[in-house]
Amino acid sequence: MDSKESLTPGKEENPSSVLTQERGNVMDFSKILRGGATLKVSVSSTSLAAASQSDSKQQRLLVDFPKGSVSNAQQPDLSKAVSLSMGLYMGETETKVMGNDLGFPQQGQISLSSGETDLQLLEESIANLNRSTSVPENPKSSASSSVSAAPKEKEFPKTHSDVSSEQQNLKGQTGTNGGNVKLYTADQSTFDILQDLEFSSGSPGKETNQSPWRSDLLIDENCLLSPLAGEEDSFLLEGNSNEDCKPLILPDTKPKIKDNGDLVLSSSSNVTLPQVKTEKEDFIELCTPGVIKQEKLSTVYCQASFPGANVIGNKMSAISIHGVSTSGGQMYHYDMNTASLSQQQDQKPIFNVIPPIPVGSENWNRCQGSGDDNLTSLGTLNFPGRTVFSNGYSSPSMRPDVSSPPSSSSTATTGPPPKLCLVCSDEASGCHYGVLTCGSCKVFFKRAVEGQHNYLCAGRNDCIIDKIRRKNCPACRYRKCLQAGMNLEARKTKKKIKGIQQATTGVSQETSENPANKTIVPATLPQLTPTLVSLLEVIEPEVLYAGYDSTVPDSTWRIMTTLNMLGGRQVIAAVKWAKAIPGFRNLHLDDQMTLLQYSWMFLMAFALGWRSYRQASSNLLCFAPDLIINEQRMTLPCMYDQCKHMLYVSSELHRLQVSYEEYLCMKTLLLLSSVPKDGLKSQELFDEIRMTYIKELGKAIVKREGNSSQNWQRFYQLTKLLDSMHEVVENLLNYCFQTFLDKTMSIEFPEMLAEIITNQLPKYSNGNIKKLLFHQK
């Protein structure tokens, strides 16, 4: 807004704030100043005007109003106080007031008359001001009640040349009466009420229709914070080092609050506090109608005054008002303790608008200060006649609801946490079968092992096993027991150790006089780590369903097509199983693919024989639970010869009474039973892995037979069966290749199985396969 605006009042304006043209009328700035002192001045001319040029860097002048009458000493420049107050409430420090009908003296000042009547009016106004703003002296506050009125001239030098030029231009447009209004005697210093007001060099006649008080609420880059507008009963928060929850101000700056809510700063303060007002709803609201800008002087507002202020210093690094941070500058914290500035700088203060509560509103929340210099704790701030409420914020480290982490001594008294079962996460009852488990999982594992149950998962072998759902899927529960390392041999070993300890306890009691005799401790402890066989049990694929419709009449084509589709899904399951075998993925990727292409028929035929042996006593072929080839189906064309080879495997397993551990080791060895003639890319690693599982087969035999002379004989029989699988698989592959190449049979093959057969046909026709046999023919 331009500084040359008319001061001509409208008809609707309040007469108390209008400058009339008649001599002797009164100017009332009370409503405009909003809480400032009412200054009544008798005007000797028909119009009153004041203009001055002041830079943004001005010197603050301190004015002392004694409690008594006005003394005869040289009076300070009250016009600067009026100018500063007007700038404070209008949003800028350089307030421009001007009108076309205002008369300005030629000297650039308005002298105050020494008339007795005018002096009485001024004394009466000052007395009213002292009565309204006087408060009892704080015994711990050394600062006197004063008002910071004008900035320092060192920081804000005046430009008198601009002032004189402006006054010459204004002289021609103002009234003819150039007399000065005298309120003081000649021996008292005169001062200009509007001395600090700045006028631009433009014509004062511009924009005469606008109000001079509608100035742009913008701040010069060197100015202070924008003013805070207040209501008619506005008050400023009082900060004192002896009170709790006070606003944070600069060190050695101790603001006071009079009874009527006016702010009085100490004479040593160079800082103007932003105004905090209260609304009729009894809560504090900060109003900033202007633009908040960073100040170059890094002045900190609302910082607590305490002896240990040097911990923080006069400079702050960020600005945050009402929880809003600007991009660098000062930090302004309202109603928060100083510990949060140094310790919780990454957290913004939270201000909650809390209505008055009858029960909990006796005083403000106690803020616990911290610091190395015995920082004064923030105290209680009470205003007479006003409801006291909680500030709604405290540092996170000071909040009572935030509990500190328990110390080691407190945790020791509460006791150790309960031990959980490694299978279902229920409360463990002890170490069962070498693993910390509950009683339910202990009984389940014992029954599952001794009963030799062949559990099947209805899902994908990834069921959740916990306290509530542990009975839903016994297959996944049993798998999790094996993964945890449960083993029946651990219990037997534990009993042996316990028996040895009991036997040696009596001997040690008898020979307790001899310190050389000690309790015998076994040299070997039970193996609690899972073995390869237990891992093979865990990764064993589930039984797949063929989806065969038994209500439809059987045919060779339909059965063969269904078996091919089932075989394609079994090959996918075999690939996943092979990748889970310990050591197999260490081989080269090409070697892994080659071994799977050579052994896929071995794996499916041997698994078919195992299912037929366990479920049908080797009399039927159990391809799937919903597809069992009985003697009637074997009589179909092209079915009997192939079924005869498959029944051979089942019958041999039944004859030898192969255990589940032996079956798992033999199946793994069938995966490693055929290689190319040129060898594998990681042949040495392959030989090492194969030898490892041969030893595992020997361990499974020893586990079944014990330390007997028949172990080598059984090992011979089982390895002989493995060698015979090559002949069985060769016959099955020949028939499979024939049906794949003969399009007249119209037997469908899944995509993956067709790809494997296509890659395998040239290798078999060229004889590029080397059989790894245990025995020479």
Swiss-Prot record:
The modification Phosphoserine is found at residues 45, 113, 134, 141, 203, 211, 226, 267, 404. A zinc finger (NR C4-type) spans 421-441, 457-481. Keywords: Acetylation, Chromatin regulator, Chromosome, Cytoplasm, Cytoskeleton, DNA-binding, Isopeptide bond, Lipid-binding, Metal-binding, Methylation, Mitochondrion, Nucleus, Phosphoprotein, Receptor, Steroid-binding, Transcription, Transcription regulation, Ubl conjugation, Zinc, Zinc-finger. SUPFAM superfamilies: Glucocorticoid receptor-like (DNA-binding domain), Nuclear receptor ligand-binding domain. The modification N6-acetyllysine is found at residues 480, 492, 494-495. Residues 524-758 form the NR LBD domain. Residues 487-523 are annotated as: Hinge. Acetylation by CLOCK reduces its binding to glucocorticoid response elements and its transcriptional activity. Increased proteasome-mediated degradation in response to glucocorticoids. The modification Omega-N-methylarginine is found at residue 23. Residues 1-23, 130-182, 394-415 are annotated as: Disordered. One of its GO terms (cellular component) is nucleus. There is a cross-link at residue 419 (Glycyl lysine isopeptide (Lys-Gly) (interchain with G-Cter in ubiquitin)). Residues 1-420 are annotated as: Modulating. It holds the Pfam family Hormone_recep. Residues 1-14, 151-163 have a biased composition (Basic and acidic residues). There is a cross-link at residues 258, 277, 293 (Glycyl lysine isopeptide (Lys-Gly) (interchain with G-Cter in SUMO2)). SMART domains: HOLI, ZnF_C4. Heteromultimeric cytoplasmic complex with HSP90AA1, HSPA1A/HSPA1B, and FKBP5 or another immunophilin such as PPID, STIP1, or the immunophilin homolog PPP5C. Upon ligand binding FKBP5 dissociates from the complex and FKBP4 takes its place, thereby linking the complex to dynein and mediating transport to the nucleus, where the complex dissociates. Probably forms a complex composed of chaperones HSP90 and HSP70, co-chaperones CDC37, PPP5C, TSC1 and client protein TSC2, CDK4, AKT, RAF1 and NR3C1; this complex does not contain co-chaperones STIP1/HOP and PTGES3/p23. Directly interacts with UNC45A. Receptor for glucocorticoids (GC). Has a dual mode of action: as a transcription factor that binds to glucocorticoid response elements (GRE), both for nuclear and mitochondrial DNA, and as a modulator of other transcription factors. Affects inflammatory responses, cellular proliferation and differentiation in target tissues. Involved in chromatin remodeling. Plays a role in rapid mRNA degradation by binding to the 5' UTR of target mRNAs and interacting with PNRC2 in a ligand-dependent manner which recruits the RNA helicase UPF1 and the mRNA-decapping enzyme DCP1A, leading to RNA decay. Composed of three domains: a modulating N-terminal domain, a DNA-binding domain and a C-terminal ligand-binding domain. The ligand-binding domain is required for correct chromosome segregation during mitosis although ligand binding is not required. Belongs to the nuclear hormone receptor family. NR3 subfamily. This is Glucocorticoid receptor. It comes from Aotus nancymaae (Ma's night monkey). The gene is NR3C1.
